[in-house]
Design a protein with these regions (language model features):
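Short acidic-glycine-tyrosine-enriched beta hairpin
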Residues: 66-81
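Conserved RecA-like P-loop NTPase ATPase core
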Residues: 52, 101, 138
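A short alpha->loop->secondary-structure connector
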Residues: 92-95, 105-120
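Amphipathic alpha-helical segments enriched in hydrophobic/aromatic residues interleaved with Lys/Arg
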Residues: 114-171
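A cytosolic small-molecule/anion-sensing beta-strand core signal
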Residues: 56, 72-73, 91
Length: 172
C-alpha cells in the first residue's frame, strides 16, 4: 500500500459509507468490516471522525500517514480525524473499532489540551489492560439498548480516550 496519490484518497464517514454517525459513537468488530474487504482497507481518511482500534488476536499491518506499523495482539491504533490510514489484517483478526465524531471529542476534551495533543498523533502502541477493559465496556454498551445508554456511552468514551492518551504518552 502506498499513498503516492494523496489527492485521490477517499474520505469516508465509516469506510465505504458516506452518512454521518447516527449514534453517540460507533463501535464494531474489526472482522465486521474487514472480512467484507478481504481483510484489507485501502488508504482513506475520516474528515470528522477519530478512530481507536484494539487488536485482541491476530495482527497485520497499519499504514498511518504513509508509515507502516506492525499490528500484534494487544495493539492499540490511534487514528485522529483527517489522517490517511489503511489496514491489512491477517485473516480472522479479532478486536474492535470505536469511532467518535469531532463533536463528541470536543465535548469531552474541552479543558484538557495536553490530552488533545496526545490524541492528535496517529500511532500504534501497546494497550494497557485498563484500555482493553474500557474498549470491551464501550462494545457491550454500544451493542445493548439499556436505559441511559447515550449517557453511559459518553462517559465510557471519555474513559477510553483517557486510557488512549496515557498509552500515547507512554509510547512517545
Amino acid at each position: 500500500m502506498h499513498f503516492s496519490n494523496i489527492d485521490g484518497i477517499r474520505s469516508y464517514s465509516l469506510f465505504g459509507e458516506s452518512q454521518h454517525l447516527p449514534d453517540v459513537l460507533h463501535c464494531e468488530t474489526i472482522a465486521e468490516r474487514s472480512a467484507l474487504h478481504d481483510w484489507e482497507l485501502a488508504p482513506h481518511r475520516h474528515t470528522r471522525l477519530h478512530q481507536v482500534l484494539l487488536v485482541q488476536s491476530g495482527g497485520g499491518v497499519a499504514h498511518l500517514d504513509g508509515e507502516q506499523h506492525a499490528l500484534f495482539p494487544g495493539a492499540l491504533i490511534n487514528v485522529p480525524a483527517g489522517h490517511v490510514h489503511a489496514f491489512r489484517f491477517t485473516q480472522h483478526t479479532q478486536g474492535w473499532v470505536a469511532t467518535l465524531a469531532d463533536e463528541l471529542m470536543d465535548e469531552i476534551l474541552v479543558r484538557v489540551g495536553d490530552v488533545r495533543r496526545d490524541l492528535a498523533r496517529p500511532a500504534v502502541a501497546p494497550a494497557t489492560p485498563e484500555l482493553a477493559q474500557a474498549m470491551a465496556q464501550v462494545w457491550a454498551e454500544f451493542s445493548g439498548r439499556d436505559k441511559a445508554r447515550a449517557l453511559v456511552l459518553r462517559g465510557l468514551s471519555a474513559t477510553l480516550l483517557g486510557w488512549v492518551a496515557r498509552a500515547m504518552d507512554l509510547h512517545h
